[in-house]
């Protein structure tokens, strides 16, 4: 089976700009002590999370547009030059039109077309690979990839197994072509396995269980997670796929500047880094501040580490994620922004 690395291409898709949006409202662990049976020490020891954000001033498209605007303003991008908008999300404003269409209008990208991509916590990786393919084909010059989720809208705040974990946020990257094949997106390995569907899902609201008074009363419109199964599969999936992409590209632990993992649980992140043979210090972490923001976690890490001066041009990165579906994957790229 051919993979992205097997193809001969003239361009790499390079991340040339980043942006982010974080809601103002902060929910710390003490907030949850008041509504469920838990405490700060337990949450930190089990998840690594201390705080998360909750959006009170808009929908997913608003957060996505604010992240895009942050990118546009900080990197002096003309929104009318954006060709394509891809929004990775599991919390769209509505089933249709696509969140990308709403973002297109809000940021003034009048010449862009776009679509949404649903792959849960792996969504940004899947969207990044899709956007890179559009760039590598030579047809498009600017592809905006956004990870955005308003998880607070599908959380049962009485369910200790899930309400502690998730936060709201959005983050964006801009992909552009480069003839310098030493930088940009270099390889990807992506997977899905539908046999894991009932371990992490929202049962109600779609065509299988359309909304009724009964589905609402039964709590089918909020997220369900089999925590033990997801933890076990996520550790294996993220660790195995990260090692696989390193071996495929002859990367040693010294060659990798950072592991950029989906921020689901600090123990999963540590286990993945350990399996890759890299020190924990080389794993990007912000789960303590924002929790699991689903499709936004990886671009949030990239944006923060770049703006803090920790990411340098030429740094080799291994991105890894695992999410509902099950979906999982890894992308190898070399950072290309000075």
Question: PLM features: what roles do these ranges have?
Answer:
Residues 2-57, 159-232, 236, 240, ...:
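Condensing-enzyme catalytic core mediating Claisen C-C bond formation in acyl metabolism
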Residues 136-170:
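Flexible, glycine-rich active-site loops centered on histidine and acidic residues
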Residues 21, 88-93, 119-122, 147-152, ...:
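Acidic, glycine-rich active-site loops and adjacent beta-strand->loop/helix elements
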Residues 41, 78-84, 111-113, 141-143, ...:
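Short acidic capping loops at alpha-helix termini that bridge into adjacent secondary structure
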Residues 300-320, 326-338:
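Catalytic phosphate/nucleotide-handling subdomain of diverse soluble enzymes
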Residues 15-17, 57-115, 125, 248-272:
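Conserved beta-ketoacyl condensing-enzyme motif
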Residues 42-46, 50-62, 90-143, 274-302:
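Conserved catalytic cysteine-centered active-site region
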Residues 39, 60-75, 99, 233-248, ...:
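Short, well-ordered amphipathic alpha-helical segments that serve as non-catalytic structural scaffolds
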């Amino acid at each position: 089976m051919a993979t992205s690395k097997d193809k001969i291409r003239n361009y790499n898709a390079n991340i040339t700009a980043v942006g982010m949006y974080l809601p103002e409202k902060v929910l710390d662990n003490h907030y949850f002590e008041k509504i469920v049976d838990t405490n700060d020490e337990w949450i930190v020891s089990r998840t690594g999370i201390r705080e998360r954000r909750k959006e009170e001033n808009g929908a997913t498209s608003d957060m996505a547009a604010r992240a895009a605007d942050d990118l546009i303003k900080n990197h002096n991008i003309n929104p009318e030059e954006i060709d394509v908008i891809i929004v990775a999300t599991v919390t769209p404003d509505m089933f249709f039109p696509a969140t990308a269409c709403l973002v297109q209008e809000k940021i003034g990208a009048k010449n862009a077309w776009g679509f949404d991509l649903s792959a849960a916590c792996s969504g940004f990786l899947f969207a990044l690979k899709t956007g890179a393919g559009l760039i590598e084909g030579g047809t498009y010059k600017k592809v905006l990839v956004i990870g955005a989720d308003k998880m607070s809208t599908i959380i049962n705040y009485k369910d200790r197994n899930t309400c502690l974990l998730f936060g709201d946020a959005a983050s964006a990257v801009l992909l552009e072509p480069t003839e310098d094949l030493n930088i940009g997106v270099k390889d990807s390995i992506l997977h899905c396995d539908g046999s894991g569907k009932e371990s992490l899902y929202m049962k109600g609201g779609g065509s299988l269980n359309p909304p009724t008074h009964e589905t609402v009363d039964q709590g089918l419109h909020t997220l369900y997670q089999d925590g033990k199964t997801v933890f076990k599969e996520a550790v294996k999936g993220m660790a195995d796929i990260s090692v696989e992409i390193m071996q495929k590209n002859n990367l040693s632990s010294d060659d990798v500047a950072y592991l950029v993992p989906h921020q689901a649980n600090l123990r999963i992140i540590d286990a993945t880094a350990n399996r890759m043979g890299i020190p924990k210090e080389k794993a990007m972490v912000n789960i303590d501040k924002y929790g699991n923001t689903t499709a936004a976690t990886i671009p949030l890490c990239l944006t923060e580490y770049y703006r803090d001066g920790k990411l340098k041009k030429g740094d080799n990165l291994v991105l890894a994620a695992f999410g509902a579906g099950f979906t999982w994957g890894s992308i190898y790229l070399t950072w290309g922004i000075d």
